Structure formats: structure tokens, C-alpha cells
Amino acid sequence: MCVCECVCACVCMCERACVCVCVCVYVCVCVCVCVCVCVCVCVVNCLDRHVHTCPERVALIWERDEPGTEVKITYRQLLELTCRLGNLLKRQGVRRGDCVTLYMPSCPLAVASMLACARIGAAHNVVFAGFSSEALADRIRDAQSSTVITVNQGVRGGKVVDLKRTVDQAVQNCPSVQQVLVAMRTENTVAMTDRDVPLEEEMMKEDVVCEPVAMDSEDVLFLLYTSGSTGKPKGLVHTQAGYLLYTSLTHRYVFNYHDGDVFGCVADIGWITGHSYIVYGPLCNGGTTVLFESTPLYPDPGRYWEMVERLGINQFYGAPTAIRLLLKYGDECVQKYNRSSLKTLGSVGEPINTEAWEWYHRVVGDGRCPVVDTWWQTETGGICIAPRPSEPEAEIIPGMAMRPFYGIKPALLDTEGEVLSSNDSTGALCISQAWPGMARTIHNHHQRFTETYFQPYPGYFFTGDGAYRSKEGYYQIIGRLDDVINVSGHRLGTAELEDVVNQCPGVAESAAIGYSHDIKGEGVYVFVVLKKAAEVQEDVLARQLREMVSRSIAKYACPDFIQVVRHLPKTRSGKIMRRVLRKIVEGNTDELGDLSTLDDPDCVREVIRGHQRLRGDGKQQ
């Protein structure tokens, strides 16, 4: 008998009749998710049913790296492309239950490849096209893929990236790979081997009709690898019905999406945000979704907002790290473009600090667009906590995710595993009942799945994040629990500290970490990136920031060291690599580990030199 409630998720949106029977699928001994086992097809809900009603509606707008060269793909065209690819995959020996690895930039062929896999009953494993060959090989081997799909080269920020070369290096260590399908993003030729298949040439030989395979609701839709605390990536498994239901509902209600809107999520499809809110959620809703291939600074810091004006984007969904980056360049880069089409602004990937939130709302949204600071994870499949949906004029508090989505029941637990039932409490963020979009397991490692997410707090799904529940019952994410600094017995969330530091007029963004301290247990070390036009002496800045932290939090929270850096070490998806900063501060620079995912590896050397100078003079401590 399962002690938690079940969520019934029936995804029978297609026009076909199907017989559904509800069963409980046990994810662990005390958490189950109730779904409808039915004969329905995920890809039919994303394509076929819309082709029946609105074949010429634009499904995808490919915002290519080159500004002003966007390509629009209708639902009819996307279905034909998907069917040709599905038939090609079948000709290459891909069958139901296989897993196809994709190493591609954000482009229509990548979306069609994902949908083609779903159409023939294969799972897809999209790997961000910025990972190294070693990281790609690890994911191919774990997924046991016999087929890889890639492009000759990627184009991003005006630079050409040799993706095919990376795949060639990776598959040398992947004996399972039998064929690599190669599409042409640029006109540059690449070396082809007997294993390689020219994708466009072979695809055009295929028929435009490919009957979809009927799938059960709990059949695998895709694998997506995410970082684990042990360092080995986790191949999280998402399934057909519950995932599609959850992404479509959250897309529609969190962003107040309506038919005819243009949805602009600027994430990469290699991450869960791209899967859920570029591909599956918008397409299931019959929406028009933007594929952004470039960077926020190419060719200039106005790229996002020029795109908003040109494409008439109604909902914009981006990362706080990009917002903080653009904030450095001032308001003019935003205000010279017409953004009247915008109705909702979204934030994803990490907690957004108050200053960035207010700039986003005031400057980008002209003070009229609600900002939805969304909290969720690869594991959750879709948004779990956000300011919307709610009453139209309901309060939105800067920097807070606020309200659980339908069916999500958050719980805060203390270090003893006791539920904190009162408001004005801080604890480990858990979820007390199952929901349709949750991952079902880790590929080939179900024991690791249960140990990671269910054993820490039996009866609850453990998110790994800490959260604060306000007196009003609203939720604020305070950061990963491994990002909590314990100063003299006081728990200090890095997100809370960074939020204060980032309110300094000269600061663009910051990263706070803990380091070993002989007396306090842990001290506080803060890295600061200044705004482009800021001119301030470091000792004056340090004094100012300490005063702000003392006022806003407490004296114990004051940083021991404040180091000004030009850039923070980040992954290509924009996440700060805090483990690298911790190693530098602890003096373990020979143990930095794999830096292949860094966007700018040179910045690490600059951080090391600056740290050595700062600790060498001993002025701040």
C-alpha cells in the first residue's frame, strides 16, 4: 500500500479512441505515480493532430546565429521532415527500444530527430553540443547507442565549431556505434568514413509518411544526463505520457500561453529546459516556438531584444546569468528596441537575485510584464514552483519562486528528517507526493536513483535544494544544500548572500563559497564581477559590501575575502562551476578536475592569480 497520494495523468489528446486503465507505477517503496496505461503516441500529440487542424501554422522559428536570417517551419513541414527521418532511422536498423544519441546545435533538424525517434519508438539522448569528446563518449556508452546524429559544424557567436570532429573522436571509444548520420549546417566539407551517412541526401530518398508506433504511457521517451555529486553523470529517464502532460500544462499555465503566441525560450535543446519548453511543451500545445542558435552578446548586447522585436515574441524565458550579464551593458541596449509584444518574462536555471529581477521587470518588461522565477530540475521534468498560475493581479515578490504548481506538494524538512510545518521556516526542499513529469529512474542504475532521491528523507522526493517558506507561505530557493555555508554554527545560503552583494550598484554578479576556517569552521569567500562602467577601488568595494551584508543578513555573514574577477568560471549553459572556485580557494589547484565544459577556460588562471595576490597580502581577512 502506497502511503502517498497518486496523480492520475492521462495524455489522450489525440483524436484516436483509446482504452485507458489506471495503474500504480512504483518508483520506490513509498512513492508512486499513477498514470494511464494507454495506446497513445507522444509525437502524434506534438505534430499530427495540429497538422489536421492548422497545417500551415508556424511550429518552429529557427533564429540562426546570423541575425535576420530566421527560418520558419510549419507543422506540415515539420511532420514531413520527422517522417523522412523516422524512415531513414528504420532503414539504418533503429528499432523500438533503441536509444539514439544526438550531438547537435539548436536547429529544426535536431527537433525533427527527437520527434523521429519518438515516432518509431526509440528513445533519444541529446548531448549538449559543447561537451568534450570524452563527455560525449561517456554518454554514448552508458546509453548503449548504435546510432549518433550530428552536423558537420555548429555556428555560435560568429564562430564555427567542428562538431563532427568531436563525434569522430568520441566514437573511437564507443564500440556500440554502427553509424553516424551527418547533416550539413555549413557548406564546409568534412571527412566521411564508412560509418558516416550523409543525412540530407539519404533522408530525401524516404517517404513523407511514417506511421507512429503506439507506445504505453510508461515507455521511455528520452534519456538526459545531468551532473551527480559523485561526478559520474546520471542518465535520467523520462517517459511518454506523464512527461508530455506535465510540460504542456506548465507551459500553458505558468506563462499564460495562448494560441497564436510566439514563445521564446533561449536555452539550448541539450538541456532539460530546451526539451520541455522549446520542444515538447510548446509543440504539444500547438504553439510557435523559437530555436535560438546564437549568444546574448552576438553581434551586440541587444541581440535578445532585437529578436523580440523582429519575431514578435510574447513570452521570453532566459537564465539569470544572461540577465546579469546584459545588465552590465546598461538600459540603452534594451530600450532602443520595441518590446511591446512581450507579455510574460521567465527566469530559469538558478535563483534570480533581486537587482537582476528588478532590472528585468523594469527595463526589459517596461514594468508591465510579470516575471515568473521558475524552480524545477532535470529530475522534475517541468516547472514545480513559480509565481504563476495565480489570480491575474496576485502579488509577485522579486527573487521568489513562490507558489507550487498544480499537484506539487512541497515540504521542508530539518536535519533530523522532521517536517517543518510552520511558515517562516528554512529546510531541505522535498516533494511529498508524486507528479506526472518526474523522472522514473536512472538508466541502468535504479539503486542510485532511490539512494539519491528517496533514501535521504524516506517517503519524500529529495530535491537537493534548500528553501525558505515565508510567513505568507511563499517559497524562496536558497541554493543547493551543498552550497550552504556553515559559519560558526549559522547556516548561510549562498543565493541569499549573493542576492545582497548583487544589489551593490557597481556589481554585475557574484559567487559566494565557503572555505575551511580554523575558528569559525567555514569562512565566506566572495568573487565579484563588476559592471562594465564601474570604477571603484577594491578595498572601498570590500568595505561597502561587508556593510551591506551586515545590514541585510548579519555580521556573521560578512565575507572574509572579496575578490574582483573579470569573469566567473561557467559551463557553456551558464552555470557557475563552484567546485572549481572551492578548489582554488582551498589551494587545491592541481585537483580542479575536468574543465572541458567551461565556456572560458582561461578565466580559471586569472582567478588563481588574483586569489594568490589577495591571500598573499592578507589585508582583507
Predicted features, each with a name:
Residues 3-4, 35-37, 67, 147-217, ...:
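ANL superfamily adenylate-forming
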Residues 403-407, 418-453, 474, 490, ...:
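Conserved ATP/PPi-binding loop(s) of AMP-dependent carboxylate-activating enzymes
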Residues 203, 284-287, 314-318, 327-395, ...:
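Gly/Ser/Thr-rich phosphate-binding loop
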Residues 44, 56, 60-115, 132-137, ...:
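Conserved AMP-binding/adenylate-forming core of the ANL superfamily
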Residues 102, 127-153, 167, 309, ...:
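AMP-binding/adenylate-forming catalytic core of the ANL superfamily
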Residues 242-262, 269-315, 325-332:
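Conserved AMP-binding/adenylation subdomain of ANL enzymes
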Residues 56-58, 178-183, 187-188, 193-225, ...:
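Conserved pre-ATP/AMP-binding loop-to-beta segment of ANL
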Residues 182-183, 519, 551-576, 588-618:
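AMP-binding/adenylate-forming catalytic domain of the ANL superfamily
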